[in-house]
A protein has these predicted regions:
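Flavin (FAD/FMN) cofactor-binding and adjacent substrate-gating region
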Residues: 66, 87-156, 160-161, 167, ...
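Glycine-rich Rossmann-fold phosphate-binding loop(s) that bind the pyrophosphate
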Residues: 2-6
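Glycine-rich FAD pyrophosphate-binding loop
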Residues: 15-36
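C-terminal catalytic lobe of FAD-dependent flavoproteins
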Residues: 279-371
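Active-site substrate-recognition segment that forms the wall
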Residues: 12-17, 74-76, 190-318
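Hydrophobic anchor at the start of a short beta-strand
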Residues: 21, 107, 184
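Predominantly flavin-linked oxidoreductase catalytic cores and closely associated redox partners
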Residues: 139-220
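Dinucleotide-binding Rossmann-like beta1-alpha1 core, especially the glycine-rich loop
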Residues: 40-118, 237
Length: 371
């Protein structure tokens, strides 16, 4: 249930294991309500001290490249990722550097002066240093979902439209009728909390992220993915992606926003427009005066520790809950789907970090997302 990246990749891996699989979503695959929507996503191994996600990210890059070679679809751009460490608040970046050193992940550390020379798009004011991961980059998000679903169909799977809900005992209903199957994987993203108000909602908070795309300057390639990396700027609550395939430069200042998933329109807030332009003036001065050419409203399901959810329902033993993206699941999609399929087929148990019970807030150094 759910045809975003988590559901699509899980369905694909189940089908490739020879399991007769049906993928159901309320809307057309790739629809704009999903957390997996938008043109692109950052893929990077940078996860603080967390070696688990670092390994998964490195493996996921290879898996995305394999899918790209298999299908001929351009899914991955290796433009690198730059992590800007704010002076006085560098715990997560310090921990990442230690993790990369232990695990042999290639990276560079740049001083503010070196940032200004190597990446002149950025004003390094207030930055202590930056970590640059050259093997990171971006995944084409919308294309990635549609590619996974196309491969799923070719593997013998079926894709259907339907509305899945639960009753007051959290039993599944499809279009108003009881849903029965040997295995049901619930990968409905932010809707999972509404479907499971007792089991999931206490550990899953839905927040909105407003994203702007700004035009690159006339005649300039400085802000294209060939010349500029993706970046994360925790001190400013921001992240971004260079222009790719004509998108414009993606920049987001994360202002946690509430949303009614079924009633609210996916429109950005005026406050976000002003905050993002203010950020661009400070950090990306070469974009000052350029027009906003596109915008997206994305929602994420945020868990207290920003770990994913992959666990069996405590009562309905054939229901496997898979999600809790916390803003960093998409890039792990191929590995996540393979893992969930294995748990669903009971080839192995889930990881302790993915269990529903025992969730707690982590410090920025411990958190895999730095949140």
């Amino acid at each position: 249930m759910g045809a975003g990246i988590a559901g699509a990749m899980t369905a694909l891996h189940l089908a490739r294991r020879g399991v007769r699989t049906r993928l159901i979503d309320r809307w057309e695959p790739g629809h704009s309500r999903a957390s997996s929507t938008d043109y692109n996503r950052v893929i990077r191994a940078i996860h603080g001290r967390d070696e688990f996600y670092t390994r998964w990210a490195r493996e996921s890059i290879l898996r995305w490249m394999e899918l790209q070679a298999e299908t001929g679809q351009k899914l991955y751009y290796q433009c690198g990722a730059l992590i800007l460490a704010t002076a006085g608040h560098c715990d997560w970046e310090d921990a990442t550097a230690d993790t990369f050193t232990r695990m042999g992940v290639p990276f560079y550390r740049f001083s503010p002066d070196e940032i200004a020379v190597r990446f002149p798009q950025f004003d390094p004011t207030g930055i202590s240093y930056a970590l640059y991961e050259p093997e990171a980059g971006m995944i084409m998000a919308h294309r990635g979902v549609l590619t996974a679903i196309d491969l799923f169909r070719k593997a013998g799977g079926t894709v259907d439209r339907g509305h899945v809900m639960t009753d007051d005992k959290e039993r599944l209903m499809l279009d108003g009728k009881p849903l029965e199957a040997d295995l049901v994987v619930i990968a409905t993203g932010p809707w999972m909390g509404e479907m499971y108000p007792r089991t999931i909602k206490p550990i899953s908070r839905v927040v909105g992220v407003n994203v702007l795309y700004t035009s690159t300057p006339d005649g300039s390639t400085q802000f294209d993915q060939d010349n500029m990396p993706c970046w994360i700027d925790h001190g400013q609550g921001s992240f971004g992606i260079p222009s790719c395939e004509g998108s414009g430069v993606k920049a987001a200042v994360v202002i946690p926003d509430t949303i009614d998933l079924d009633k609210d329109e996916r429109l950005i807030r005026r406050e976000t427009l002003n905050r993002t332009r203010s950020y661009i003036r400070r950090r990306l001065p070469g974009l000052v005066g350029q027009q906003v050419v596109d915008s997206k409203f994305n929602q994420i399901a945020l868990t207290p520790d920003t770990h994913f959810i992959v666990d069996w329902h405590p009562v309905h033993k054939n229901v496997l809950l898979a999600g809790g993206c916390s803003g960093h699941l998409y890039k792990h999609g191929p590995v996540f789907g393979d893992f969930v399929a294995g748990v669903g087929m009971r080839d192995y148990g889930t990881a302790d970090r993915f269990k529903i019970a025992g969730r707690k807030k982590l410090s920025p150094k411990e958190s895999p997302s730095g949140r």
